[in-house]
Regions:
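RNA-binding accessory domains that recognize and position tRNA/RNA substrates
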Residues: 1-204, 208-209, 223, 337, ...
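Proline-centered loop/turn at the N-terminus of a beta-strand
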Residues: 106, 171, 242-244, 260, ...
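Active-site glycine-centered loops adjacent to acidic/histidine catalytic or metal-binding residues
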Residues: 112, 247, 290, 333
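Beta-strand-turn-beta hairpins that frame and shape the catalytic cleft
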Residues: 167-172, 280-283, 322-327
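Active-site-proximal beta-strand elements of phosphoester/diester hydrolases
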Residues: 171-176, 286-287, 328-332
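Cysteine-nucleophile active-site neighborhood
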Residues: 213, 218-285, 296, 339-355
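Catalytic beta-strand/loop cores that center a nucleophilic Ser/Cys/Thr
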Residues: 282-324, 361-362
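A glycine-centered loop/beta-turn motif at secondary-structure junctions
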Residues: 319-361
C-alpha cells in the first residue's frame, strides 16, 4: 500500500505503508544509530514524535522484547529507507511490521531518508503527517501541521503509581518523567533499592520516605511545559539529598534553579555523540536523545552551577555541577541502551555521593 510523508514546509515523500494504516501528525526527528531501533521505539522520550532512522536497513535482527526500554512503544510513527521483513537472529520473537501493527503505530518505508535528514538539518525539526490517503489536500493539511504541538507529554508517559525495586544498598527515589528501564536497572544492579515515583509526586512525599539519593529521569517534550514539576524539583534542590539528573531531568533542574533552556535546530539523537568532561579533559562517546539544551552560561554567571560536560561537535552544554550541593546533571544517557556505555561510571559517582559502594573507574 502506498503511503506519504508530508512535511509542514510542503515536501512530500512517497513510499510504502508499514505498520498501522491510520493517519498521524507528529514532530519529525531523525536518529543516527545503526542499531537499537527497538530501544528507540520504546523510549518514552520519543512520545509525540515520528522517528526517521538514518541507517538504510532497519529490522534485520528482529524484535527482542527483553530489550524494550519501557512497557510499550511511544513513538507516533516510524520512518525507514528499507525494512527487513525476514529477520535473522536467534533472540528474535517478532518483526517490526507486526510490532507496529500490534501497537497501532503507522510508518513509511522506501523513502529517501538521507534527503529527509538533510531537510531537517538545514531547516530544523518540523511537524509532518504520515498518511495512506492518496487524495491528500496540502492546502488543508499544512495549516494543521503548523498548529500541532506535543503538549504536556510527561504526564502521558509517567508511571501511574509508586513502584519499588528491592535492594540492600542506598535508597534511591527515581522521579519518572518517562524513565528508560535501564536507568532503574543501572541503579538496582549496584544494589540500590529504587522507588519509582509518578512525575507529579510532591517533593514532600518523596523526602518523607527519606531517600539516600534522588534521580531525575529522562522524558519527552518541552521542559518549560512542566511547570508543576519544576516547582517540586526546586524543593528537592533545597534539601541536602544528593541528586543525579539525566536528559529532561537535567533541563528541569536548570529551570528550577533560575536557569533557562531553548529548543535546538534539530537536536541530538543517536549513539555516537562525543562529550568532553571539563574536569578531566577526557572525551566519551555517548547516547543522546534531546531537542532542548540548557543555557549553561546563565547558571554559571549566577554562581548556581558550572558546566561539567560539553558536546565536542557543537559546543552545547552536556552537564552541570551545582555549587555547594551534591548535585550533578547530564544531558546525555549514561545508561545507554542503545549506545555506548562509556559514561556508566557516573552511576558509580552517584553511589559514592550517597555513601554506597564505590565502583567508579580510577
Amino acid at each position: 500500500m502506498k503511503a506519504f510523508l508530508i512535511l509542514e514546509d510542503g515536501h512530500v515523500f512517497k513510499g510504502t505503508s508499514i505498520g498501522s494504516t491510520r493517519e498521524v501528525i507528529s514532530e519529525i526527528v531523525f536518529n543516527t544509530s545503526m542499531t537499537g531501533y527497538l530501544e528507540v521505539m520504546t523510549d518514552p522520550s520519543y512520545a509525540g514524535q515520528a522517528v526517521c532512522m538514518t541507517y538504510p536497513l532497519i529490522g534485520n535482527y528482529g524484535i527482542c522484547y527483553e530489550d524494550q526500554e519501557s512497557r510499550k512503544p511511544w513513538i507516533d510513527g516510524f520512518i525507514v529507507r528499507e525494512l527487513s521483513r525476514v529477520p535473522s537472529n536467534f533472540r528474535s520473537v517478532d518483526t517490526i511490521q507486526h510490532f507496529l501493527e500490534k501497537h497501532d503505530i503507522p510508518g513509511i518505508a522506501g523513502i529517501d531518508t538521507r534527503a529527509l535528514t538533510k531537510i531537517l538539518r538545514e531547516k530544523g525539526t518540523m511537524n509532518g503527517m504520515i498518511t495512506v490517503n492518496e487524495n491528500y489536500d496540502l492546502d488543508e493539511i499544512i495549516p494543521r501541521l503548523k498548529a500541532y504541538t506535543t503538549g504536556k507529554v510527561v504526564e502521558k508517559v509517567t508511571c501511574k503509581e509508586k513502584e519499588v525495586l528491592k535492594g540492600n544498598g542506598p535508597k534511591v527515589a527515581l522521579m519518572d518523567f518517562g524513565a528508560k528501564r535501564n536507568i532503574a536497572h543501572s541503579l538496582n544492579e549496584r544494589g540500590c533499592q529504587v522507588t519509582i515515583y509518578p512525575a507529579l509526586t510532591p517533593a514532600e512525599e518523596i523526602l518523607k520516605d527519606a531517600p539516600d539519593g534522588i534521580m531525575l529521569s529522562n522524558g519527552p517534550g518541552d521542559p518549560k511545559e512542566c511547570t508543576t514539576i519544576i516547582e517540586e524539583i526546586r524543593k528537592l534542590y533545597e534539601s541536602d539529598v544528593p541528586i543525579f539528573a539525566i536528559c529532561l531531568g537535567h533541563q528541569l533542574m536548570a529551570l528550577a534553579t533560575g536557569g533557562d533552556t531553548h529548543k535546538m535546530k534539530y537536536g541530538h539523537r543517536g549513539g555516537n555523540h562525543p562529550v568532553k568532561d571539563l574536569e578531566t579533559g577526557r572525551v566519551y562517546i555517548s547516547s543522546q536523545n534531546h531537542g532542548y539544551v540548557v543555557d549553561a552560561e546563565g547558571l554559571e554567571k549566577k554562581g548556581i552551577a558550572k558546566p561539567a560536560f560539553i558536546n565536542v561537535n557543537d559546543g552545547t552544554n552536556e552537564g552541570m555541577a551545582y555549587e555547594g550541593k551534591n548535585i550533578f546533571t547530564v544531558q546525555f544517557h549514561p545508561e545507554a541502551c542503545p549506545g555506548p556505555q562509556d559514561s556508566s561510571y557516573l552511576f558509580d559517582r552517584f553511589m559514592k555521593m550517597m555513601g554506597g559502594t564505590d565502583r567508579a573507574e580510577k
